């Protein structure tokens, strides 16, 4: 199948998402009648007359056919950045977003398909006008390397002296027309895809020492490209139709007009990966990693920026014409953008088919390498330790990442602990967090899970005809019902509350970047085996996308691919085991071999805290007292 036919087929699959109008829901209600104006944000506006965004595969001849670790296109093409517009989970979510809120997809397309958005083909919030090859290229080379710092200063671009004509200060030419129209994103507005791009075909990047410009367009040195602020553009995401109320809740903004401030923190915080980093030790002073788990060939091993971890320094060359001395350098940023997605890029290749996938550079070997990078990133993001405290097993999960763990989109994403106590013969005595691999179901509702539960509530639920607390409707989210994700180093409750990222239904002390869970040790257990699992897409979310979609087949397609690729098979982030002292079991809190008044005193002294929690619910209370009395003697 040709590239044009593949795009047309995919566009037809999702085009019907733009035809829904006031569709009634079970239980009443209708789609919220927003307009395109409700999703207007500052930044460069869609304009079909700007220089076209070229497809990433066109960069392969110089940037993709050599070193599998350093060649930018070779690693980028199998990343979720590259495949963000082909992601079947996103297609299904986009259809439901447009069902729920008219034009809601415009907010999604800004970051998932910026080339199409900038070319004016994302109007209405659907993909029905995605006809050009770069439209499905996701966040491709041209998108990032034409981005402009919206704030002039030391991070502004400087033109290479070899450019003809020489332009030492190219950014004001881009920003001045936007300033005249009141469209330069100000502080707090540089999120939600409110990017500034050069309307001209130029190349901006982080290096000032590129020896030769082989492009037919100007090159500019842009320090902005080495900063996390560039990543903030699409990694702090808010529900644009919401507005913060005086009581701290988020309600429905007035429809038919842009958001009154366009500031992300005045909207519901759907994703806050950048803000989580900004309010951490990483942003303030950096975090050293003597084990070099992050950063690749980084000169110090001190991680400060998003790029330090997600674009690690690599020994090699950024161009196939410079693969030999003296052009090889130690700091080529790897463009794999490793993250937490364990299966979707495989599904993208399957949807395209081998011929079309290979034509866009999505070779099977590159997919396998990308998945391997993601799995290693997950393993590096956490550490886990086990210890015995009397009759309890303590499991500590340490967040080693620069943001919450897990972070990003909350829908369908979770971690959980599987704890299995075994006897001397190897038989399972007790288990928490059991999982059914055949159905993709977490069987234990009381298992320790980490994630965020965001819901639709109050006036948004009423306007959409949904019950309070409805799950997964991403365009309608306006309440954090629970968020027990583990914060990063340097976390403070006050700073996180300012951007809506404070823990909900969980408690972390300032500076705490770990979580402890206590498990009562059952009689007969001689060993405990613990695994921290991560899952990209839960069964509940996959079924929601299938069942809630009344627009097209993208929900069924996403569900079928989810099944085909192992039901988003959970990935082990950490696993460990510990031998259990036989004298320390059950409610024997002081490990003296008997449950008596001494243990009762310990339990009562720990009342309301987790330190004598026998049933694993996180607190010492009457349930634990009942367990102790039942084990008396």
What is each of the regions a protein language model found here?
Residues 9-18:
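Bacterial N-terminal signal peptides
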Residues 110-122, 126:
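Conserved, well-structured interaction surfaces
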Residues 23-42, 69-94, 125-512, 517-523, ...:
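Primarily the internal scaffold of c-type cytochrome electron-transfer domains
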Residues 90-107, 117-120:
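N-terminal catalytic scaffold of extracellular/periplasmic and nuclease hydrolases
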Residues 1-10:
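Bacterial N-terminal signal peptides that target proteins for export
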Residues 42-61:
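Local sequence-structure signature of Cys/Sec-based thiol-disulfide redox active-site neighborhoods
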Residues 582-633:
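Cellulosome-associated attachment modules in secreted, modular CAZymes
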């Amino acid at each position: 199948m040709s590239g044009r036919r593949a795009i047309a087929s995919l566009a037809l699959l999702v085009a019907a998402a733009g035809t829904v109008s006031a569709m009634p829901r079970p239980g009443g209600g209708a789609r919220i009648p927003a307009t395109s104006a409700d999703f207007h944000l500052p930044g460069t506006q869609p304009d079909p007359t700007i220089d076209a965004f070229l497809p990433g595969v066109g960069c392969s001849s110089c940037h993709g056919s050599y070193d599998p670790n350093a060649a930018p296109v070779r690693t980028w093409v199998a990343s979720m950045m590259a495949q963000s517009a082909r992601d079947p989970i996103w297609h299904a979510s986009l259809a439901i977003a447009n069902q729920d809120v008219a034009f809601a997809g415009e907010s999604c397309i800004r970051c998932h398909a910026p080339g199409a958005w900038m070319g004016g083909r994302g109007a209405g919030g659907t993909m029905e006008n995605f006809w050009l090859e770069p439209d499905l290229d996701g966040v491709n080379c041209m998108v990032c390397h034409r981005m402009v710092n919206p704030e002039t200063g030391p991070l502004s671009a400087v033109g290479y002296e070899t450019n003809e004509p020489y332009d030492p200060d190219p950014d004001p030419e881009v920003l001045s027309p936007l300033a005249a129209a009141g469209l330069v994103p100000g502080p707090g507005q540089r999120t939600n895809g409110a990017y500034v791009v050069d309307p001209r075909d130029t190349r901006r990047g982080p290096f000032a020492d590129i020896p030769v410009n082989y492009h037919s367009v100007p090159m500019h040195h842009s320090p902005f490209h080495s900063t996390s602020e560039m990543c903030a553009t699409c990694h702090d995401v808010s529900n644009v139709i919401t507005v913060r109320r005086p009581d701290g809740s988020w309600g429905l903004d007035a429809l038919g007009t842009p958001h009154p401030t366009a500031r992300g923190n005045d909207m519901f915080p759907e994703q806050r990966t950048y803000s989580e980093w900004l309010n951490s030790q990483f942003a303030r002073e950096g975090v050293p990693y003597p084990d070099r788990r992050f950063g690749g060939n980084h000169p110090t091993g001190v991680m400060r920026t998003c790029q330090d971890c997600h674009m690690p320094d690599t020994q090699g060359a950024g161009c196939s014409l410079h693969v030999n001395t003296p052009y090889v350098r130690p700091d080529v940023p790897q463009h794999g953008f490793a993250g937490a997605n364990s299966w979707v890029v495989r599904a993208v290749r399957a949807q395209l088919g081998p011929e079309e996938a290979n034509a866009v550079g999505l070779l099977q070997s590159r997919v396998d390498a990308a998945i391997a990078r993601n799995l290693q990133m997950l393993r590096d993001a956490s550490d886990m330790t086990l210890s015995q405290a009397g009759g309890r097993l303590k499991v500590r999960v340490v967040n080693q990442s620069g943001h919450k763990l897990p972070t990003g989109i909350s829908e369908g994403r979770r971690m959980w602990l599987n704890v299995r106590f075994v006897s001397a013969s190897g038989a399972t005595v007790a288990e928490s967090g059991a999982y059914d691999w055949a159905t993709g179901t977490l069987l234990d509702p009381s298992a320790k899970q980490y994630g965020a539960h965001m819901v639709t509530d109050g006036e948004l639920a009423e306007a959409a005809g949904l019950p309070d607390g409805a799950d997964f409707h991403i365009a309608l989210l306006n309440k954090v019902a629970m968020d027990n994700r583990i914060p990063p180093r340097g976390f403070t409750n006050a700073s996180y509350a300012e951007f809506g990222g404070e823990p909900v239904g969980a408690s972390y002390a300032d500076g705490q970047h770990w979580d402890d869970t206590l498990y009562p040790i059952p009689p007969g257990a001689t060993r405990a085996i613990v695994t921290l699992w991560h899952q990209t897409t839960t069964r509940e979310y996959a079924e929601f996308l299938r069942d809630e979609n009344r627009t097209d087949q993208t929900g069924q397609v996403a569900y079928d691919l989810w099944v085909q690729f192992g039901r988003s098979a959970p990935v082990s982030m950490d696993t460990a085991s510990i031998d259990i002292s036989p004298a320390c079991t059950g409610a024997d809190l002081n490990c003296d071999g008997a449950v008596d008044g001494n243990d009762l005193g310990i339990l009562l002294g720990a009342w309301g805290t987790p330190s004598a929690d026998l049933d694993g619910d996180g607190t010492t209370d009457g349930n634990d007292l009942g367990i102790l009395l039942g084990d008396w003697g």
